[in-house]
């Protein structure tokens, strides 16, 4: 879909929010914006950005329908702040199903596949429900196992022969380790591919990062990366080429901007900005996600012509200034994932007495040797030019810290 073909959906969106959104009514009034003057996608630059702070401060003012019409109540994960509520109508839930169905097909899926869901479908988590509905819409099967529980995961794989796993990729090495420890021939299993959610598996040049290499060096499966958020209610999913997540232009208008808010060029890094199309409950205009990605506009070798996003390099709010060096958490994760002895870790970011960032990596107690600490110091220095502090706790305590029951995702990163 070209910008011209997105225009009718954009016009419907502008009319919808101007009539029903208290937040955008106020913004249009304060900025003297005439929505009738915004006739093309290019005209969107006349509108101010919507930020995470706006959503948090005026949450329910974004709602465009009575709450009696809401089918599903969800919240963001609240990684950096309190969770923000999102309200989905029946139409919005169907839009989610359409998105995931098309995303699965982009990742080589079909109605003959059986998906095993290794993430939660409850806890107000939009994506878990979306995956199930997408598989149903496509005509595929799904086994809803949920997060963790390696025994149940393998029992389900052996019993039902799923072909695709949907999981946070850092869980997969644990799954492999469990199989090895329990004499499960995972290489001969029915699994052909893994849809990796929530964490990058590629470097900006599209090569596999250390986590991706760790998985594929042990298990001959195809990895597909995805990028999504509750706010956009849609996903950028890789195709077989593995050259970035494809935009679904029926569901989103994409901008990628620099620090001044101007569009970046082909292949450049910028902040992802989305305008949601076809959303009834809580549509968003020019929403700044805070996520930094490279953008690609050239047609993909798979034949799709929609823009693609590279892996998330970092989040603007998660940028760490440590000993004069700017670091994003994925760079720390990549170093840790390169060390085969490390199967659990947590990165803790804090402020010292002078207000400067400090980084501490928490690791299992059995790794606490002088040789290991020296190896890690050298590795961090060579890869990042700086070395964080290391601290050690029991594996039981670290597992408890990372896999908290009330959390929807592993807490690999903590700010205190």
Residue ranges and their predicted role:
Residues 1-16, 138-416:
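Active-site glycine/GP-rich loop and adjacent strand/helix microenvironment
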Residues 1-75, 81-98, 102-106, 111-112, ...:
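Nucleotide 5′-phosphate-binding alpha/beta core
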Residues 44-46, 72-74, 102-105, 124-126, ...:
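Short hydrophobic/aromatic-rich motifs at helix boundaries and adjacent loops
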Residues 76-77, 135:
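Hydrophobic alpha-helical segments that mediate membrane insertion or helix-helix packing
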Residues 90-103, 114-174:
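AMP-binding/adenylate-forming
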Residues 112-113, 267:
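Beta-strand-connecting loops/turns
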């Amino acid at each position: 879909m070209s910008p011209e073909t997105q225009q009718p959906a954009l016009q419907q969106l502008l009319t919808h929010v101007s009539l029903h959104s208290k937040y955008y009514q106020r913004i249009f009034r304060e900025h003297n914006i005439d929505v009738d003057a915004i006739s093309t996608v290019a005209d969107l630059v006349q509108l101010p950005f919507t930020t995470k702070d706006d959503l948090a401060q005026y949450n329910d003012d974004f709602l465009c329908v009575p709450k009696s019409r809401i089918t599903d109540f969800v919240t963001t994960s609240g990684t950096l702040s309190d969770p923000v509520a999102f309200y989905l109508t029946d139409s919005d839930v169907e839009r989610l199903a359409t998105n995931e169905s098309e995303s699965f097909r982009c990742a080589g899926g079909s109605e003959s596949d059986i998906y095993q869901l290794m993430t939660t479908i409850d806890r107000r988590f939009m994506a878990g429900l979306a995956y199930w509905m997408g598989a149903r819409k496509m005509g595929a099967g799904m086994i809803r196992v949920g997060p963790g529980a390696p025994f149940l995961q393998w029992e389900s794989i052996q019993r039902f022969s799923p072909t695709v796993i949907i999981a946070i990729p850092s869980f997969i090495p644990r799954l492999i380790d469990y199989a090895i420890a329990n004499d499960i021939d995972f290489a001969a299993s029915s699994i052909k591919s893994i849809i990796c959610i929530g964490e990058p598996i590629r470097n900006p040049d599209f090569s596999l990062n250390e986590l991706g290499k760790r998985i594929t060096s042990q298990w001959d499966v195809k990895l597909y990366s995805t990028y999504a958020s509750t706010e956009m209610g849609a996903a950028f999913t890789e195709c077989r080429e593995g050259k970035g997540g494809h935009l679904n232009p029926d569901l989103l208008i994409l901008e990628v901007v620099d620090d001044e808010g101007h569009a970046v060029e082909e292949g450049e890094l910028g902040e992802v900005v989305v305008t949601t199309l076809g959303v009834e409950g809580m549509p968003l205009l020019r929403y700044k996600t805070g996520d930094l990605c490279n953008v690609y506009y050239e047609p993909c070798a798979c034949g799709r012509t929609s823009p693609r996003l590279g892996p998330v390099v970092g989040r603007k709010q998660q940028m760490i200034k440590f000993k004069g060096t700017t670091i994003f958490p994925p760079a720390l994760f990549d170093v840790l994932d390169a060390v085969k002895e490390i199967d659990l870790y947590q990165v803790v970011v804090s402020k010292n007495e002078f207000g400067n960032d400090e980084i501490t990596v928490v690791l299992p107690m059995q790794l606490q040797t002088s040789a290991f600490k020296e190896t890690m110091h050298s590795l961090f220095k060579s890869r990042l030019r700086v070395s964080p502090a290391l601290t050690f706790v029991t594996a039981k305590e670290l597992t408890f810290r990372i896999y908290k029951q009330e959390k929807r995702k592993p807490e690999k990163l903590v700010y205190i």
